[in-house]
From Swiss-Prot:
Pfam families: Ribonuclease_P (PF00825)
Gene that this polypeptide is encoded by: rnpA
Keywords, ordered alphabetically: Endonuclease, Hydrolase, Nuclease, RNA-binding, tRNA processing
Family assignment from sequence similarity: Belongs to the RnpA family.
GO molecular function: 3'-tRNA processing endoribonuclease activity; ribonuclease P activity; tRNA binding
Cellular compartments per GO CC: ribonuclease P complex
The protein, known as: Ribonuclease P protein component
Length: 120
């Protein structure tokens, strides 16, 4: 059985990479979270997740991160291509089901301006 994993190259890892996305990226605001993205020169898109510690409970924070990673892994085609994408989860975010995050991301990426289909 083959495992479908995201390689380490699929993640924003360094602090300066997050800073670059926060400073120069475009923002899409959802309910309880913001997607910030910045086009890059790599062949694939990369994911970064930022969950505020004011969202109480490490179990909740880790579950949110796990669900966002899984959504990114399964639906990479709805995100901007060749971009660094950071999910900034705000303290008021409440996750009732994994389907909720997929619908929220899908509704943001289905915006009329079509920013999620931009090509580098």
């Amino acid at each position: 059985m083959e495992r479908y994993r995201l390689p380490k190259t699929a993640f924003v890892r360094k602090g300066w990479e997050y800073d670059a996305v926060y400073r120069g990226g475009r923002r899409l605001h959802g309910v309880g979270f913001t997607i910030i993205y910045l086009l890059n020169s790599t062949e694939n898109n990369r994911l970064g997740i930022s969950v505020h510690r004011k969202l109480r409970g490490a179990v909740k924070r880790n579950r949110i991160k796990r669900i966002i990673r899984e959504c990114f892994r399964l639906h990479r085609d709805i995100f901007p291509q060749k971009a660094d994408i950071v999910f900034a989860v705000r303290p008021g975010f409440a996750l009732s089901s994994p389907e909720q995050i997929r619908q929220a991301v899908g509704s943001l990426c289905g915006t009329p301006c079509g920013v999620c289909n931009e090509k580098a």
